[in-house]
């Protein structure tokens, strides 16, 4: 991660610091940990935060992951900010020409991307090495291919291949496929692939394919579209088949040890060991009449006034856990009556770290709201109550 180390003895900074398209507006001091602060900054119209941590012999200044910038822009921001310090060391050199310039989709703009997309969508959830996903995009140039993955190295590998092969129809999104599917409107996908997911036979609640996931998939699929599960785990296959058969009306296609054009490294290993591989296709037969409410979820805040007393109470509030979701106020930073609230919140399956800015006139999430799912919206309403001091036990 781009960062620099600076000596402790330096003159207090006079904000704002402005150079070119960068502005370092002000510094918020942690009310929980006196050695930490957040620098509130912007590049053009994009807000971002820098973490400033006082250690025994130096300051560590780095980016705050919840407000990401493109790597080279972030390095430039840190180089500019470092001019106000006596730098001990840094890793802010110009980027290697071999690094990939292709970026994953941002969860904050995913809703807009989906709404604007007009081509049929082929989605793969948990694409691993990316072999199947890459071939899917190469063989379907007129369709939008979407790869959803939580594993960062897999994402980096796929992005390099996309750039190398110039696959303009392939997009990558980092996140939990279960929640992303829930946030998508009806009839957006033509096909959904789930190949070799972790079986979680001892913790079945952690599986990708559950009754809720299947219902969401059938809602999102176009008529005659299908969800394809490919697995080497017999129990996972049997449980998934039982889930499919619970539907009043369904069409199912089953194959065992079918030969397919693209074989992943994982599958090649099992083929050598003569291990059985199961395919289960579940077709969407008709228009799903389940209404899609997620687009109506409102993540704005009512007016909230913060005082020293309320801030102290909020900081002492323990993590509040409800069925399927939670809210935890991790820290509060302050600057002349303005507050930055650091949060961990949302759905248990894919919690998010966010910052909320509270000033005299406004309150909002920095850069992005939580993904529009039911549990995230419930967490947002709970957060509203916490910040306004309603219903805190």
Curated annotation (Swiss-Prot):
<feature type="binding site">
    <location>
        <position position="149"/>
    </location>
    <ligand>
        <name>S-adenosyl-L-methionine</name>
    </ligand>
</feature>
<dbReference type="InterPro" id="IPR029063">
    <property type="entry name" value="SAM-dependent_MTases_sf"/>
</dbReference>
<feature type="binding site">
    <location>
        <position position="124"/>
    </location>
    <ligand>
        <name>S-adenosyl-L-methionine</name>
    </ligand>
</feature>
<dbReference type="Pfam" id="PF02390">
    <property type="entry name" value="Methyltransf_4"/>
</dbReference>
<keyword id="KW-0819">tRNA processing</keyword>
<comment type="pathway">
    <text>tRNA modification; N(7)-methylguanine-tRNA biosynthesis.</text>
</comment>
<protein>
    <recommendedName>
        <fullName>tRNA (guanine-N(7)-)-methyltransferase</fullName>
        <ecNumber>2.1.1.33</ecNumber>
    </recommendedName>
</protein>
<dbReference type="InterPro" id="IPR055361">
    <property type="entry name" value="tRNA_methyltr_TrmB_bact"/>
</dbReference>
<keyword id="KW-0808">Transferase</keyword>
<feature type="binding site">
    <location>
        <position position="232"/>
    </location>
    <ligand>
        <name>substrate</name>
    </ligand>
</feature>
<dbReference type="GO" id="GO:0008176">
    <property type="term" value="F:tRNA (guanine(46)-N7)-methyltransferase activity"/>
</dbReference>
<comment type="function">
    <text>Catalyzes the formation of N(7)-methylguanine at position 46 (m7G46) in tRNA.</text>
</comment>
<dbReference type="InterPro" id="IPR003358">
    <property type="entry name" value="tRNA_(Gua-N-7)_MeTrfase_Trmb"/>
</dbReference>
<comment type="similarity">
    <text>Belongs to the class I-like SAM-binding methyltransferase superfamily. TrmB family.</text>
</comment>
<keyword id="KW-0489">Methyltransferase</keyword>
<keyword id="KW-0949">S-adenosyl-L-methionine</keyword>
<dbReference type="GO" id="GO:0043527">
    <property type="term" value="C:tRNA methyltransferase complex"/>
</dbReference>
<feature type="binding site">
    <location>
        <position position="176"/>
    </location>
    <ligand>
        <name>S-adenosyl-L-methionine</name>
    </ligand>
</feature>
